[in-house]
Amino acid sequence: MAKASRDTLYAPLRLPRVYNLLQSLTGGSRDRADFVKRHVLFRSDEKVVDAGCGTGSALEFLPPVKYVGFDPNSGYIHAAQSRYGSRGQFLCGDADSSEVWELVQSADTFLSFGVLHHLTDSQIRKILSLAQRCLRQSGRFIFYEPCFSARDDVLGRICMNLDRGGNIKTDQAWRALLSEYFATLEEHLRRPVYWFRYTIQAFICRDPRQL
């Protein structure tokens, strides 16, 4: 699908209420919550950065932590502040923002839940570089994205080709990209996920590579 057509079709999802409704209907938040519950432990004093936090829905399943979320959509950030303002800090901006850079320093965990496939390759690398530079050496990058793989559900592959984000990669491509920034990758493939039967590739990435 051409980018202009995709942007027009999915324009309503830029509205926080529409976005939240779709997440609820498709079960996206439920699978993310299940992945975190099974594989990711948090300390109460941990600084957690949510890159592309959207409306802050990750706070529905995160335990109490020192939460920082950023997103370039001002409507999403306003909705997040209205609902979760007492539980963390929210900033409207992207990986190029100096304010974001200052706020995310010395993070223990970076989260990227279904964000990167909505970005260009250049923007994806900026997010990964931000995490690489701002994580503590003992920190981790939590990656959760749809991917194309050899065992995709037929409906899932069709839906992924029609996804709002136009940059879904193969499992090999995501793995190779992440390995440029992190030395240790713990991988979890989840399929089929959501009503749309996506294949989801999740990683817990550790040991940021030294620049």
What are the language-model segments listed below?
Residues 1-47, 54-102, 119-126, 130, ...:
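Class I (Rossmann-like) S-adenosyl-L-methionine-dependent methyltransferase catalytic domain
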Residues 111:
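A conserved beta-strand element that flanks and buttresses the S-adenosyl-L-methionine
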Residues 115:
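Hydrophobic adenine-recognition pocket in adenosine-nucleotide-binding enzymes
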